[in-house]
Structure formats: C-alpha cells, structure tokens
Amino acid sequence: IKKPIDFIMQKELGIEPQFLFAPLIYGAILTDRNKVGPSTIKESMKTVKKGKILGVFPEGGITSPVLTEAKPGAVFLASKTKAKILPVSVRGASNAWDNIQRGIRSRIYINIGKPYGPIKLDGTRQEKTQKINAASRELMCRIAALLPEDKHGCFSNDPSISMYQIENDLESA
C-alpha cells in the first residue's frame, strides 16, 4: 500500500505513549467507537477525497485474539464515502511491543485481500440497517478468509469464508 493511511482510532483510550508517533506518520481521526459522530464522517470523507486510505478496525478496536462482530461504522463509512473496502488481517502484533522491549523480534503477519465494493445502502431505515448488518458480516468473513481457522471466532462456521479464500487464491490462511 503506497498511499498515506489515516486511521480511525477510539478517543476514549487515547494514544498509548509508545504509539504517539503513529498519528504523525499515518494520521488519526479520533472517534467514539460506540457512536460515529458527524465530525468523524466529515473527517473520513475529507481523507478519502484527498486520495488517502482510511484505515478502520471494523470491530471497534483490537481487543480479542479471535474475530468478533463488526460495529456498523466501517460499512457505513465505506458507503458514505463510496470507497472500496480492502480487507486486511494482522496477526502476531498483540505482543510485539512487549517483545521489542525485551529484545525479542516478533513475527507479524499481514494478509491483504482483494478490494470489493463500494457498498450501496438504500431503502427504508430498516432495510439500510439490514444491509449494514449483512455487509458487516461479509467484511468480517472476508477478513476471516485471510486468517488461520482458529482465529475466525464467531464466524467459524460461515461457508462464505472458503469462497473468499478461493477469491484471494488461498486454500486456507
């Protein structure tokens, strides 16, 4: 990925001291992960209009070693900005900082799937909600396809994962 990335980060946690450099290098849009506000949407749209990549953690942060349900914000923002979604999985980063401090080099695996979208949300409010939920599930299954099976979490038995693995030229991650 050769373009600048601005990440949406949860403001309630702030930025941990060891990551203070990240917003300077990448850019950060601070948001409430439970409720996407108008300023987040405006900043996200500005980022995309500038030709930058908007990095979003669909689960609302990194809190579990396995995949969990996505919050609606990632799909909503992708729809609002008319942007394609690039599924990315990161594995092995949870202990990386601790390992670096102890002089141990961590292995971090990043898999990048094929882009898809944009997502179109139209219809009644109820229909839009259903489409957001379905698109959020699709996003998480596309990410699951890039991870080993033991990391699929609540998506473990979803048959679409194998279809996305084939789409990404993976037998299984």
Q: What is the role of each PLM region?
A:
Residues S39-A173:
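Non-catalytic C-terminal accessory region of glycerolipid acyltransferases
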